[in-house]
A protein has these predicted regions:
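PLP-dependent aminotransferase class I/II
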Residues: 1-144
């Protein structure tokens, strides 16, 4: 039964991929006004991702704590997720494990502490992304 459902979904795979790409672009365009406060992910050169989520990093210069922003979004019924694990060597599992580190891991720590993602699944559309944009502008004092 699960295999049959999976095969049926495969027939719609390209539709899902195209919709995720469209949704990523819609949300990216809608959040352009917040570039002073937020860093938005970009596809790397020569890539064509099917975005599972919309990564957002709160800039240190914004003066905002990610937790405060996430609480605000949650209070406004906007779902978010943290990225898996962040800096793995800061996880309890690594407390008694020998490992070596090359460099400072500043990007990894920044991702762990300041990044979250919003959904871009195919069931969302322009109205949803406008709502998210309006609420983020409100949070950062841009929505007058």
């Amino acid at each position: 039964m699960q295999a049959a459902c999976g095969l049926a979904q495969l027939e719609r795979a390209q539709e899902f991929i195209d919709t995720r790409k469209r949704n990523f672009k819609l949300l990216k365009d809608r959040l352009a006004s917040l570039s002073e406060f937020l860093e938005i992910a970009e596809a790397t050169p020569n890539s064509d991702p099917s975005w599972f989520g919309f990564p957002v990093t709160v800039k240190e210069s914004s003066g905002v704590k990610r937790v405060d922003l996430l609480k605000f979004l949650d209070q406004n019924r906007i779902g978010t997720r943290l990225l898996f694990a962040g800096n793995l060597i800061r996880q309890p599992y690594f407390q008694d494990v020998e490992y070596r580190v090359v460099g400072e891991l500043t990007n990894t720590d920044r991702t762990m502490n300041q990044t979250f993602w919003l959904g871009v699944y195919p069931g969302l559309g322009q109205d949803h992304f406008d709502f998210v944009g309006d609420k983020l502008e409100e949070f950062f004092g841009l929505n007058f």
